[in-house]
């Protein structure tokens, strides 16, 4: 069934236009309240947000929707997405809500929903919410005495900080390490430096001065250049870059070289296998992960299981088949022993645990394999379905034929932005570049 509001990661769009308005947020709150208001107990929902200006608009609208359906609302303020997921379970809430557009610029915002178990909602539940958003909400309003209340939870950040610290080996500290942490002027701007400081590190901060407009602006995991420069300038041991809602992480070694999610997953898989804590003979990643990771894991006797793009699909497969390590090349790392969704800070602590356990620099620990040449191009379009065009389909078939068995193509429509993503990968870099550029040119021509 086609979706009207939800994409691959909740509802997302440009703030105060289209589906990302106060009116839509009100209806999301009412509809989700309708779906999750079950039984006779006092119902509650928790709401967190990142640092975007539009969060001030969406938070009260959602609160109004939920309270009108008789649900109490606990407000966290700026807090990472994985913290909202964790606190949904910890506070025995019926539903968790994160207001964020993740790695997007401040103009965008989004609404992510978590069930009482802390996991993102299934497609079926999201479709049920969509149905109620457009059908008869007024018939299910709470009575005058049954309205919900709203309360701000002052210690939400402290609760999450303690949770994250407990994922780090008790016998270790971060003393002696100089760490650059880039918080993308986002949701983790307070909690991430505090965690590292409390564990004993010397902390150098980047992107910790949000103003409502500068989230992800030339900083964070999608723009790690400032973090890398700070590592070199301050002679740090490691750099850590989170995105706007801190569910992604990218690492930099002491030379300022970037280490992506594939390398991080490989490191955690190897370490957990050695520790005997890997719950399955492999990990779960998406079709975007580099073939180099697959070959490296194979050398360890481990499998790489691929899903479609989106950390929710990675998590679904992990839950169904018993895996406890998974994620995406972009830095969504899901460690199911500790969290129900991607948690950039917890993933970074696992890298730091390996670093502290040995006497080698990050450059020797984290560069596990040489990735195959890979090129990703994003083509923006205004309307329609460019991938259904006959010329585009023919260009894709020709590209697949040219690559043959030496490479692969992944071409898909983004679930969060009006983009077509064209990714090519293979042993021959020149061939990969040529194939991707040719396909991108045809898409650009037909999407103009």
From Swiss-Prot:
The protein's Enzyme Commission number:
5.4.2.10
What is annotated as the active site? 102
Q: Which reaction does it catalyse?
A: alpha-D-glucosamine 1-phosphate = D-glucosamine 6-phosphate
Q: Which residues carry this modification: Phosphoserine?
A: 102
What CDD domains is this protein classified in? Answer: GlmM (cd05802)
GO MF:
magnesium ion binding; phosphoglucosamine mutase activity; phosphomannomutase activity
Q: Which domain of life is it from?
A: Bacteria
**Is Metal-binding given among the entry's keywords?**
yes
Obligatory cofactor(s): Mg(2+)
Q: How is the cofactor bound?
A: Binds 1 Mg(2+) ion per subunit.
**Gene Ontology CC annotations of this record:** cytosol
> What are the binding positions for Mg(2+) in this chain?
102, 243, 245, 247
Whether Ion transport counts among this entry's keywords is no
The record's similarity note reads: Belongs to the phosphohexose mutase family.
What is this protein for, i.e. what is its function? Catalyzes the conversion of glucosamine-6-phosphate to glucosamine-1-phosphate.
**In its UniProt entry, what is this protein called?**
Phosphoglucosamine mutase
Q: Tell me the organism.
A: Parvibaculum lavamentivorans (strain DS-1 / DSM 13023 / NCIMB 13966)
